[in-house]
């Protein structure tokens, strides 16, 4: 009887050891790297020009608004970007009071970025009366403040109420398979449409195929996959936009856009991010391979 008890105990201990070893092995082989911590140690903050309605101690606007200077790097007096701990994990709070960019210290080539995001309540000028707005900028290159005195040149995965995943080309360009659909006035609008001809976007917006945004206050999962000059925008598991042939500008001879930093915008709306993580990506998963056009057409620019 004692031998049976000892045997049962030994089996139990062995099972426990094997279970722990398997869990530890899985953790050790995980390629996801968390990018968010209480000190934002993997990021730097650049704050743009405050709206005249937002008082900032020590800041004076120029007589000519075009000559207003951004607050600049590591100068965030209103604490636009802060981190708080919620249930033991860091949550990035973006007040939206002033346009800004939270910029990764590292540049990335092939990557899979995954975040959870939700809207807050407050909105600020000049975005009052407009949809809440934010954005995940990637393939960022060049100087801080190159775009609107605040952001770097980049491709943008738009994060805006009811159209998360749109493409905005802020200095970078990319091609999207898309078709025209009715716009307002003389503006042409384009929507990503699988199998449609490729068109070049250099500053204009390529609307997503479909949106699966959860109600305000709920956490959405946003993913950006980028390999070489191609990328995907994914919202809550659904592909919203497919980009390819990205370059550093519309002029002939501009180099292919295959690496860069990541920026998270502040753009007039309160919001939160959590579980910001990234992993290397050598190629797109098999289920996404067929989404890209097999040809590099010479598209016209909308």
Task: Label each residue range with its predicted role.
Residues 8-18:
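Bacterial N-terminal signal peptides
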Residues 23-302:
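Carbohydrate-interacting regions of secretory-pathway proteins
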Residues 1-8:
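Bacterial N-terminal signal peptides that target proteins for export
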């Amino acid at each position: 009887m004692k031998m049976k008890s000892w045997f049962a105990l030994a089996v139990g201990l062995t099972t426990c050891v094997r279970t722990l070893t398997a869990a530890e092995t899985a953790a050790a082989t995980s390629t996801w790297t968390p990018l968010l911590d209480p000190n934002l140690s993997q990021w730097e903050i650049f704050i743009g020009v405050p709206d005249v309605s937002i008082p900032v101690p020590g800041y004076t606007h120029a007589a000519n608004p075009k000559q207003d200077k951004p607050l600049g790097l590591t100068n965030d007096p209103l604490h636009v970007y802060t981190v708080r701990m919620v249930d033991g994990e860091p949550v990035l709070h973006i007040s939206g009071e002033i346009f800004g960019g939270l910029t990764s210290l590292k540049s990335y080539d092939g990557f899979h970025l995954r975040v959870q995001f939700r809207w807050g309540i407050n909105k600020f000028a000049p975005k009052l009366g407009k949809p809440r707005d934010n954005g995940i900028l990637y393939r960022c290159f060049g100087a801080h403040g190159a775009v609107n005195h605040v952001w770097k040149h980049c491709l943008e995965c738009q994060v805006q109420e009811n159209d998360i995943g749109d493409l905005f080309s802020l200095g970078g360009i990319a091609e999207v398979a898309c078709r025209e659909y009715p716009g307002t006035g003389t503006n042409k609008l384009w929507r990503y449409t699988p199998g449609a001809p490729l068109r070049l976007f250099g500053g204009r917006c390529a609307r997503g195929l479909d949106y699966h945004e959860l109600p305000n206050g709920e956490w959405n999962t946003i993913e950006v996959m980028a390999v070489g000059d191609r990328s995907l925008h994914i919202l809550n598991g659904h592909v919203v936009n497919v980009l390819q042939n990205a370059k550093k500008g519309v002029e002939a001879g501009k180099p292919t856009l295959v690496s860069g930093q990541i920026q998270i915008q502040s753009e007039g709306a309160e919001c939160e991010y959590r579980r910001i993580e990234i992993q290397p990506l050598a190629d797109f998963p098999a289920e996404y391979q067929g989404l890209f056009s097999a040809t590099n057409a010479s598209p016209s620019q909308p």
